[in-house]
Swiss-Prot record:
Name of the protein in its database record: ATP phosphoribosyltransferase regulatory subunit
GO BP field: L-histidine biosynthetic process
Organism (species): Polynucleobacter asymbioticus (strain DSM 18221 / CIP 109841 / QLW-P1DMWA-1) (Polynucleobacter necessarius subsp. asymbioticus)
Presence of the UniProt keyword Ligase in the record: no
InterPro entries per UniProt: aa-tRNA-synth_II/BPL/LPL (IPR045864), HisRS-like_core (IPR041715), HisZ (IPR004517)
Pathway recorded for this protein: Amino-acid biosynthesis; L-histidine biosynthesis; L-histidine from 5-phospho-alpha-D-ribose 1-diphosphate: step 1/9
Quaternary state and interactors: Heteromultimer composed of HisG and HisZ subunits.
Role description: Required for the first step of histidine biosynthesis. May allow the feedback regulation of ATP phosphoribosyltransferase activity by histidine.
């Protein structure tokens, strides 16, 4: 066996990429802090029952499992940080008002994600707890778009949906868990022939409503207008459309350079989402660069129901798409025993400069740094000169 091989869909992050990832991580977390978000760092391992509380079967399948040698209980290696942050808000912080939290940490997935990305990701996200209003959803969307803009991704396509639409349509229907999962899969793929065949055992009006969802996608105002015509008049459906109208109205007034659309059959994450959902797309990536939405019921599983909304993305993917040049400029210095030189180097480093002292016999080959200046002794002092 080759000792340098890694598991399938697991990869090292090499210096140039790691530099970009870390530069973006710092800048993005500083952005979140400027909005009042507090950084939290949940553990990478938790007891499995806690880790999966309030989530669906998809997360269970994606979670690596192992036995705790101390307690004998099953542990899970987290595949998603969002439920952990919900636990922190509900159980540890226990605040009454609005709480804004952000995070950045590694997650591991047992199965290769859709789109063939790495099974190890650096998940970054922001969550708002304690506000049920549409303004919180819009703040989350705004912060996501600013995140992408900070990474240099200027052309963004934002797709909206709402979990309440299907909840309202299915109210009163006795569908088992397997049937619901099949239905969501058919809606997600917009496979109308199979959906029509699957729905033959349902009431005709319900089958027609489900088929209508697969065609309710496109420009926001057009989709909302058509949805009001073809979907049933139901409190949950009406509220969902009103929520979407609120977000679209706010976006049209204050967001520029973003193409908005609605897809009422896009229900990924349906297991825990409860309201407005959104996905951001950028050129060069067929899958969403980020996903988010409202998930008011997750905290209830930890003993404290709280309105919640937010988003997350993979920072490794974001860095790979970012056009930013994060290559660091550096100063070259000789490796000699000189107190004055050492003091100059220390002063430069304290000011944030990168100073590379060339070791005896070293041939500088690293592409990570661009040495555009060097320290040269002129008379009795060391001077910084351009190379």
């Amino acid at each position: 066996m080759n000792r340098w091989l890694l598991p399938e869909d697991i990869a090292d992050v090499l210096p140039a990429q790691a530099r970009k990832v870390e530069t973006l991580r710092r800048a993005i977390l500083d952005l979140y802090q400027s909005y009042g978000y507090e950084l939290v760092a949940p553990p990478i391992l938790e007891f499995l029952d806690s880790l999966l509380t309030g989530t669906g079967s998809d997360l269970n399948l994606q979670t690596f499992k192992l036995v705790d040698q101390l307690s004998g209980r099953t542990l899970g290696l987290r595949a998603d940080i969002t439920p952990q942050v919900a636990r922190i808000d509900a159980h540890l912080l226990n605040r009454a008002g609005v709480t804004r939290l952000c995070y950045a940490g590694s997650v591991a997935q047992a199965l290769t994600p859709v789109g063939g990305s790495s099974r190890e990701q650096l998940q970054l996200g922001a969550e708002i707890y304690g506000c049920a209003n549409g303004e919180a959803d819009f703040e989350a969307i705004t912060l996501l778009l600013k995140t992408l803009d900070l990474a240099g991704l200027k052309k963004v396509y934002l797709d909206l949906s709402h979990a309440g639409i299907l909840t309202g349509i299915l109210e009163g229907q006795q569908l088992d868990k397997e049937s619901i999962e099949t239905l969501y899969g058919l809606l997600q793929s917009k496979d109308r022939p199979r959906l029509r065949q699957w729905a033959t055992c349902l009431p005709a009006k319900l089958a027609a409503d489900l088929l209508a969802l697969t065609e309710l996608n496109g420009p926001c105002t057009e989709v909302i207008a058509n949805a009001k015509k073809v979907l049933p008049r139901h409190a949950a459906v009406d509220q969902a459309l009103a929520d979407l109208e609120c977000v679209v109205s706010a976006a049209s007034k204050s967001l520029s350079g973003v193409e908005l659309s609605i897809d009422l059959a896009d229900l990924r994450g349906y297991q825990y989402h409860s309201g407005v959902m959104f996905a951001a797309y950028v050129d060069g990536l067929p899958q969403p660069i980020a996903r988010g939405g409202r998930y008011d019921q997750v905290g209830k599983a930890f003993g404290r129901s709280r309105p919640a909304t937010g988003f997350s993305l993979d920072l490794l993917t974001l860095a790979g798409l970012s056009p930013l040049n994060c290559r660091k400029l550096a100063v070259l210095a000789p490796w000699i025993d000189d107190a004055d030189l050492n003091q100059v180097i220390a002063d430069l480093r304290n000011r944030g400069e990168v100073v590379i002292q060339v070791l005896p016999g070293e041939v500088l080959e690293a592409a990570e740094y661009e040495c555009d200046r060097e320290l040269v002794k002129q008379g009795n002092s060391w001077e910084l000169k351009k190379k």
